[in-house]
Amino acid sequence: MKASQFFISTLKEAPADAEVVSHQLMMRAGLIKKLGAGIYNYMPMGLRVIRKVEAIVREEMNRAGAVECTMPVVQPAELWQETGRFDKMGPELLRIHDRHGRDFVIQPTSEEVVTDIARQELRSYKQLPKNLYQIQTKFRDERRPRFGLMRGREFIMKDAYSFDRDQAGAKASYQVMAQAYRRIFDRFGLRYRAVAADSGAIGGDLSEEFQVIAATGEDAIVYCPASDYAANMEKAEALAPAGARPAAKQPLTVTPTPGKSTCADVAELLSVPLSTTVKSLVLATDETDAAGEIIRSQVWLLLLRGDHDMNEIKVAKVPGLDAGFRFATVAEIADHFGCKPGYLGPLNLQKPVKLVVDRDVAVMADWICGANQEGHHITGVNWGRDLPEPDMVADLRNVVAGDLSPDGQGELAIERGIEVGHVFYLGTKYSKAMNATFLGEDGKPAFFEMGCYGIGVTRLPAAAIEQNHDERGIIWPDAIAPFTVVICPVGMDRSEAVKAQAESLYADLLAAGVDVILDDRGERPGAMFADWELIGVPHRVTIGDKSLKEGQVEYQHRRDASATKVGVADILAHVKERLAA
């Protein structure tokens, strides 16, 4: 490709709404152009990156035995109503009507459609296992799209779906896909971690995320440096402190704390560690009738250490809260505690509540909590003496660095990551909901055991940039660079020697199968170099009259601070050697 034929459009400054580095550089390098909130044009330079991502994904999916198909972007609502996701997904699922008033959705994933295919086409155990995948446009109506392609509304995703006759087969298919994902991300040349994850709205009971390590990542990744343990923050288990609960030493005392409504404020006032305070979080669950009207509500009190944060995913697994919960209203809090938020605690309640205690709080002694009296807290609170031993103890919090690893191999560490892939073992969640069966070896109908496997094709380039950039621009890994080599002839329009050498090297690289672009635009050297450093092509060959007279050209890798002089006769071999490194 010659630059004069290509579409190159770079910016000196990033748009004001571009918050993270990848968004800024993708806009400045002309990879994407914003069309609307969370919706982007993939410009020619950016599309080349996306196509290279797709090619690697496709190769490894095919190698793993998956078969490509394409499912519609617009899908009948009836299928989504069968599984209940039409209502459960909420506003993220874009719903539309056709001219006849029929309901449709714009696909965010395709579990329903692929399960419908399976129940029609896969009739016997002899046809199993099967794995269908697509690389297709998706849409999720994100409430706050941001960070460019990192969290857009329209995006390209590779989604695969496996169908097996039993759990053993399904889990084997899951492992095949997980290994394929490792090969994919290894080929991209990215630093990543595979972490245990919660299955969320997709469902299932076995799940891993593939997280590209980046300081700007939205997700917290928990891992143990001394072992292979890794999980996302939602999933990582917080173990109870080792050892027995200390004996009570302090008397129960109501202490004035005027204007101190947070644990941090109280700890500072009383000159005690924040870890000796306990925060009270008040939730409510509702029972509704057939019309959706609330019949009765139950108020719950959760106790966590003052220096810990509640993990909503874990809370949602507590029996009684697993059908859904909300934060209690101010009126409900006043009715049960006789006090406004900021001074709440488990003692001196106006009405009974259901109490759930975090593991750490269950082994605390002489702790501090609200007195259910404005401007007051209670110190020296102890289980068994001042309160009955808690009936419901659960892991309710996010882990913190230094916590014990659940595998017992050391302490936990935390870093940031960008989720670029996710694999799920679904079991029969969707096949049962849609009555998707096959005839088993015993001649009886059986539900498909399923798995689903996603890769964010358009998120991957953004994640790669977050991990590979400097003050001058992007530094693409070779595997997904828009072009692998750029030839920069200085004064090509004025020097026949420069032009001839540039054209000759260009032809040689093309013949060798190298993805090369020749910059024949006639730009000034500074502007030409700035463009390609911004765009991030990893290998650059500069040809100028002065170096040619010495029988040399200059080679520079995008990560190198300076260029290396290479003989004209050796440059082709030198580039090939660097590409193979």
UniProtKB/Swiss-Prot annotation:
Cellular compartments per GO CC: cytosol
Disulfide bonds: none
CDD domains assigned to the protein according to its UniProt record, in alphabetical order: ProRS-INS (cd04334), ProRS_anticodon_short (cd00861), ProRS_core_prok (cd00779)
Intracellular or extracellular location(s): Cytoplasm
Source domain of life: Bacteria
Pfam families: HGTP_anticodon, tRNA-synt_2b, tRNA_edit
InterPro entries: aa-tRNA-synt_IIb (IPR002314), aa-tRNA-synth_II (IPR006195), aa-tRNA-synth_II/BPL/LPL (IPR045864), Anticodon-bd (IPR004154), Anticodon-bd_dom_sf (IPR036621), Pro-tRNA-ligase_IIa (IPR002316), Pro-tRNA-synth_IIa_bac-type (IPR004500), Pro-tRNA-Synthase_IIa_type1 (IPR023717)
Major site of localization recorded for this protein: cytoplasm
GO molecular function, one term: aminoacyl-tRNA deacylase activity
Catalytic activity: tRNA(Pro) + L-proline + ATP = L-prolyl-tRNA(Pro) + AMP + diphosphate
Alphabetical keyword list: Aminoacyl-tRNA synthetase, ATP-binding, Cytoplasm, Ligase, Nucleotide-binding, Protein biosynthesis
Class of this enzyme: ligase
Family in the record: Belongs to the class-II aminoacyl-tRNA synthetase family. ProS type 1 subfamily.
UniProt domain comment: Consists of three domains: the N-terminal catalytic domain, the editing domain and the C-terminal anticodon-binding domain.
Oligomer status and interactors: Homodimer.
Function: Catalyzes the attachment of proline to tRNA(Pro) in a two-step reaction: proline is first activated by ATP to form Pro-AMP and then transferred to the acceptor end of tRNA(Pro). As ProRS can inadvertently accommodate and process non-cognate amino acids such as alanine and cysteine, to avoid such errors it has two additional distinct editing activities against alanine. One activity is designated as 'pretransfer' editing and involves the tRNA(Pro)-independent hydrolysis of activated Ala-AMP.
Name the UniProt record assigns to this protein: Proline--tRNA ligase
